């Protein structure tokens, strides 16, 4: 079955990851190695009538694990439900290596949280994701997701469809109130934030040094 295959894949990763850690320990490199474990997406496994990955932005697909270990440097046993993006890994490593982070990078270093210098309860006010084959339609629907600590907005661009969930009252994401009366203020505010985030991520190119 699909779930049995999924469990088998988890065991395979667990076994091979264990081999890697054991090698680092056997070669006396574990204490001087930063280990980062994550993945690019989750699996539906039947949730919302879907299997495998892709086409939607439910929590089971976009909420992925992120485990960071560095014995003696990263605070042990620390857990956080703060909003984090995988793009935060790069500035985290840059801070560890004492490399200045350019202003144009969107990621935020997790190092202050990992070392206990900052509370683990909050990191970013929102996170964003994009998918370029949403809804599995032949015309390749573009879609974006914006999620803050309470709400999740999904916009399927060009076809007038969307989703809006209150994750505090509806953590399973079953009640889409995109079209409900009274949702306009929340929806419009989040659409604006998502549009701003999209534009702020555009590469500005080299600085102009001559007259226009």
For each predicted feature, which ranges?
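Phosphate-coordinating loops and pocket residues in cytosolic domains that bind phosphorylated ligands
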Residues: 47, 176-179
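Histidine-centered active-site microenvironments of extracellular/periplasmic hydrolases
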Residues: 22-78, 85
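Short glycine/proline-rich turn/loop motifs
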Residues: 1-4, 70-73, 171-174
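A short, conserved beta-to-alpha structural element at the edge of catalytic cores
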Residues: 65, 69, 192-202
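A short beta-strand-to-alpha-helix junction
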Residues: 3-12, 56-64, 74-91, 97-109, ...
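C-terminal cap/loop subdomain of S1 sulfatases and analogous C-terminal strand-loop tails that border
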Residues: 41-47, 87-90, 95-167, 172, ...
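A long, amphipathic alpha-helix that forms part
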Residues: 1-33, 192, 196-198
């Amino acid at each position: 079955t699909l779930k049995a295959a999924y469990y088998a894949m988890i065991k395979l990763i667990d076994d091979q990851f264990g081999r890697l850690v054991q090698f680092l320990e056997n070669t006396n490199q574990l204490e001087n190695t930063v280990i980062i474990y994550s993945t690019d997406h989750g699996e539906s496994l039947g949730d919302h009538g879907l299997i495998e990955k892709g086409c939607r932005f439910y929590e089971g697909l976009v909420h992925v694990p992120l485990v960071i270990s560095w014995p003696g440097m990263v605070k042990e046993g620390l857990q956080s439900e703060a909003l984090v993006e995988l793009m935060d890994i790069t500035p985290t490593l840059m801070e560890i290596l004492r490399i200045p982070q350019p202003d144009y990078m969107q990621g935020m270093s997790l190092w202050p949280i990992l070392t206990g210098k900052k509370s683990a309860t909050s990191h970013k006010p929102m996170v964003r994701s994009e998918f370029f084959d949403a809804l599995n339609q032949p015309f390749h629907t573009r879609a974006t997701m914006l999620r803050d600590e309470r709400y999740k907005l999904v916009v399927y661009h060009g076809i007038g469809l969307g989703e809006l969930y209150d994750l505090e009252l509806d953590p399973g994401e079953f009640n889409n109130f995109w079209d409900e009366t009274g949702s306009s203020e929340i929806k419009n505010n989040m659409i604006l934030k998502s549009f701003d985030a999209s534009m702020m991520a555009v590469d500005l190119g080299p600085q102009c040094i001559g007259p226009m």
